[in-house]
């Protein structure tokens, strides 16, 4: 598995994100899907990671972004194609984004997910995330699960 920072503005990534959007809309109403669009993913304070099978030019099977701010790095748009799951892809994406957060001086990584995604919550917990309260501009809603990982002293 090859995992590196790449532009999200490529057809395979756009297709993968469309799959993620379609999946999330089967779980949650549109007003509770807090997704970043393509222009937002291309902002300078956002790092976008891509996982490829078979090397640097292989098929894209996963992606994830981190929005860097002085307070924390927020994980967004983590998705692994069903055919690529169970191979450490999500773990690899999170590890690369954690390095970026540390390099940017972030003390924490945070994320918002939903209760209908127990597999995702399990991945985050295995990576050291713990549940926390709402952060940023998110409303405190029962259809949101907020998690954080402290990066200092880890």
Could you tell me what each predicted segment is?
Residues 5-9, 14, 107-110, 114-127, ...:
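C-terminal "cap" of GNAT-fold acetyltransferases
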